[in-house]
Amino acid sequence: RIVATNALRQAKNGHEFIQKAAEILPKHIEIIAGREEARLIYLGVSHTMVNSGRRLVIDIGGGSTELIIGEEFEPIHTESLQMGCVAFTKAFFVDGEINQKSFDKAVVAARKELSGIANTYKEAGWDTVVGSSGTIKACRQITVNMGWSNEKEELTRDGLDKLKEKLLKYKHVAE
């Protein structure tokens, strides 16, 4: 099975891409819905976990973010929200400019996007949170490299706050 996610769901030339890809790939590319993407992410993550219990899996992609609550190999709540790192960079950090106002606008937009699922997810609860995306892994590695957490420590709110403070000292992503 070959699947395409948010990039092709949103692309204006997605079907053209699929036609070209069909010429070289052995199978048809299936553009999957966001919730199916979330389900597959959860299954992939759950097969790498040794602990049991209810978990929240977060995957921040370029165009979307998937949030999944599940137990063992069974996803219970699956959501795909339109708030990926590339989409938010283009929308709120125009021309690579970094400032508090842009951060604030991005946070407001993220909260608005999350508002539709917040109560359901809070009521469901979870024991652990797992980040599965390159975005989360990069944030984690930066906090370790900067000495804001150690190799065994999780990515914390404190570490993320320090990362934000550090980013705000720069005026542009090129710095």
Q: Model-flagged regions — what are they?
A:
Residues 56-64, 68:
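A generic, well-ordered mixed alpha/beta core segment in the N-terminal half of proteins
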Residues 2-54, 69-175:
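Helical "lid/coupling" subdomains associated with nucleotide-phosphate turnover
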